[in-house]
A protein has these predicted regions:
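Active-site neighborhood segments
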Residues: 1-22
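Domain-level detector for long, ordered catalytic/regulatory cores in large eukaryotic signaling
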Residues: 21-160
Length: 160
């Protein structure tokens, strides 16, 4: 789905998880708890490929000026490998600009916010505990399972 289609698609799921976070669900009986057990639920890791992760979490594409979901390094500084100098993203900053994007009165205003910050609204931000910076996994299938990360380190950076 496109960026505009993803939020209405996940909104009912987020509604359910808000209720499960605040009220939970009560099981009348379980094998270990004959008197019943209450359970609260949360969505924590967002595990998907990089394109879906960016859409779901409200980050800009990996082609954007702000290409990283963990820092505010600009594409023009992409050759900077000194990670101590990378300005870290924060939840407060992300939520603030995502909320501004959501409340914008026009598509032009939304585009300006998105272009300037690399952030847009995600329905997942309605979850009171959800932190897109900490909970978005770094494309585990391609990075780890298919060993793209290892190949990148060995072939691109020349580290063995």
């Amino acid at each position: 789905p496109s960026m505009d289609q993803i939020n209405p698609l996940i909104s009912p799921l987020v509604d359910d998880f808000i209720d499960l976070w605040h009220h939970g669900v009560h099981y009348t009986t379980t094998p270990c708890h004959p008197a019943g057990k209450s359970c609260k639920c949360a969505i924590i890791p967002l595990v998907c490929d990089i394109l879906a992760a960016r859409q779901m979490a409200g980050f800009a594409s990996h082609h954007h000026q702000f290409f990283c979901s963990f820092c505010h390094l600009k594409r023009s500084d992409i050759e900077n490998v000194n990670w101590w100098t990378w300005p870290a993203r924060t939840l407060d900053h992300h939520r603030h600009h995502a909320q501004k994007w959501r409340l914008a009165h026009s598509e032009d205003e939304r585009t300006k916010i998105y272009d300037g910050t690399g952030v847009r609204w995600s329905e997942l931000l309605r979850l009171p505990y959800w932190d897109p910076i900490r909970y978005t996994a770094l494309d585990p299938m391609h990075a780890l399972f298919l060993n793209a990360f290892g190949t990148h380190i060995e072939k691109i950076w020349g580290i063995s």
